[in-house]
Amino acid sequence: MYNEIPTNRPATPLLDSIDSPAELRALSEKQLPQLADELRAFLLYTVGQTGGHFGAGLGVVELTIALHYVYDTPEDRLVWDVGHQTYPHKILTSRRERMHSIRQGGGLSGFPKREESPYDTFGVGHSSTSISAAQGMAIGAKMAGTERKVAAIIGDGAMTAGMAFEALNHAAHTETDMLVVLNDNNMSISPNVGGLSTYLSKIWASKFYNSLREGSKQVLGKIPPAWEFARRTEEHFKGFMSPGTLFEEMGFNYVGPINGHDLGDLVRCLRNLREIKGPKLLHVITQKGKGFEPAELDPVGYHALNKIEPKKAAIGAVDAPKKVKFQDVFGQWLCDMAARDDKLIGITPAMCEGSGMVGFAQQFPERFYDVAIAEQHAVTLAAGMACEGQKPVVAIYSTFLQRAYDQLIHDVALQNLDVTFAIDRAGLVGEDGPTHSGSFDISYLRCIPQMLLATPSDENECRQLLYTAYQYPGPAAVRYPRGTGAGAVIEQAMTALPIGKGVVRREGKQVALLCFGTLLPTAAQVAEKLGASLCDMRFVKPLDSELIARMAASHSLLVTLEENALAGGAGSAVSEYLNSQGIAIPLLQLGFADEFIDHNSQKQQLAQQGLDAKGIETAITQHLAMMAAATKAVAG
């Protein structure tokens, strides 16, 4: 048991001898506990050096070893859900010496990635996709005539999503030969653990029991009343002893729960289950943060870890004041607004901490709904509340709102219901990479009729635009980025800002910068250097068409800036407006290129997209030069 993160690389002689699962499978079972200890120590050390997802990986060390020990990976397919727990998997699959690069530019991804390794069979970052993908692989293997085995590893939190149950239902219906490993770390499903349960699990996973079970089906199946009696007897016996009745009813052969940290039991169960045909589910109980006491005591707080920086001391040094994160700006606004309006209800799909809702949940528990990983349900739940005169606020990451797009259109916007969406992690998210990037929300929201979409430029404007959106009698969204802003002073008073109206922050000549969002401080540097005008647009929908027309009439070039894909983004909205009015003026649109942006620091990602001060200035000066050359060519 560790109480501190090791700062020196631990001795891991057995782990160092393993470069692939093939070498792991050459070990004796007696060596596996030592390997688990070394793997856990190495994981603690590397995440301390780099930062990254932490608790989930510590909890599946033994499970990961057992899976690669029993299954012939990569020929057999292991499909991981979400991916937070795959650091041990990466270490065992030829990437141990690259773990220092995880979540860094040009380094390993923090999630499974097909381009990175043949052992990463399915790219992931969002939850509840593993069972569907694994079923597809199993069907594909069968169609190809191979004997390949497929296993999906899914957590109890991810199992709450509807997609997981859709896949379970279909896999059972098609009798797909696959294994689902339910990694239960007590975040959702209550475990049924004990000596009798472990004993029954071993029996239910044994070849004898399953051959007897299948043989009985064949024999008694010819005598319908007898088979029905036997089936009901087994159902009642197992339902009394275990939580697996639901999965058995769906058509899965359920085994468990078993201790997910007992390598002997894991290996024995997996070996037996690998030989059993049809859909199977193994329920394992694990502890998130296993082996690191602070993480065991606080699994939520240690879900992810920042890089451990060396301590520095300076005489007379004064710590710089900490900037407020946008998620905390939202959290404080939510509490303040709830104190004013008892109709406010806060909803989040399993993102209470990340969305800044802990304070609200504590102060207003009767008005707080964490619906688990169920984005579709969250949005339609809010729609139903709005039908009854309540004022729901849905706090959700940009990337996860994509999963509820039909509900957004059909259940909220089509009925013009009064639902406020606080869209966190809009724009680039840094080390979490493309699976979590909020690159598309402007594009997919602004095309929805009756939707209001606001893009605050700083912390105070975020607070005021949240209040503005809340007052709007229809669907309204406020998007804001991960992390902190410029450090603006936040006014406690809440003021509804004029809808669809921007603000001129600097009057200049020739070039007008139209900024949508928190690139404003960077744009201000460029505007100052180029003598350009600068507008804080505030709203993508409705656009401040009057301000755009005024800038077009008094400048030679308009430049739009946004942290969103250029395709269909705010720049496209400006272009559409200019075209509709017959306003002929050069327009330079700056935003994200038509690509998925790989993991790196947010600063580096912005620079790579040309959205730092240097990149913006260069793009503008080059465009002006191109315009001058074109004018000269026409004149000549």
From Swiss-Prot:
Pathway: Metabolic intermediate biosynthesis; 1-deoxy-D-xylulose 5-phosphate biosynthesis; 1-deoxy-D-xylulose 5-phosphate from D-glyceraldehyde 3-phosphate and pyruvate: step 1/1
GO cellular component: cytosol
One MF term in the entry's GO annotations: 1-deoxy-D-xylulose-5-phosphate synthase activity
Pfam families, per database record: DXP_synthase_N, Transket_pyr, Transketolase_C
Keywords: Isoprene biosynthesis, Magnesium, Metal-binding, Thiamine biosynthesis, Thiamine pyrophosphate, Transferase
Cofactor: Mg(2+); thiamine diphosphate
Annotated SMART domains: Transket_pyr
InterPro entries membership: Dxylulose-5-P_synthase, THDP-binding, Transketo_C/PFOR_II, Transketolase-like_Pyr-bd, Transketolase_BS, Transketolase_C
Catalyzed reaction equations: D-glyceraldehyde 3-phosphate + pyruvate + H(+) = 1-deoxy-D-xylulose 5-phosphate + CO2
Cofactor note: Binds 1 Mg(2+) ion per subunit.
Enzyme Commission code: 2.2.1.7
Gene3D superfamilies reported for this sequence: 3.40.50.920, 3.40.50.970
Binding, thiamine diphosphate: H84, G125, H126, S127, G157, A158, N185, F292, E375
GO BP terms in the entry: 1-deoxy-D-xylulose 5-phosphate biosynthetic process; isopentenyl diphosphate biosynthetic process, methylerythritol 4-phosphate pathway; terpenoid biosynthetic process; thiamine biosynthetic process
UniProt binding sites for Mg(2+): D156, N185
Subunit-level organization: Homodimer.
Family: Belongs to the transketolase family. DXPS subfamily.
Function: Catalyzes the acyloin condensation reaction between C atoms 2 and 3 of pyruvate and glyceraldehyde 3-phosphate to yield 1-deoxy-D-xylulose-5-phosphate (DXP).
Protein name stated in the entry: 1-deoxy-D-xylulose-5-phosphate synthase
Source organism: Cellvibrio japonicus (strain Ueda107) (Pseudomonas fluorescens subsp. cellulosa)
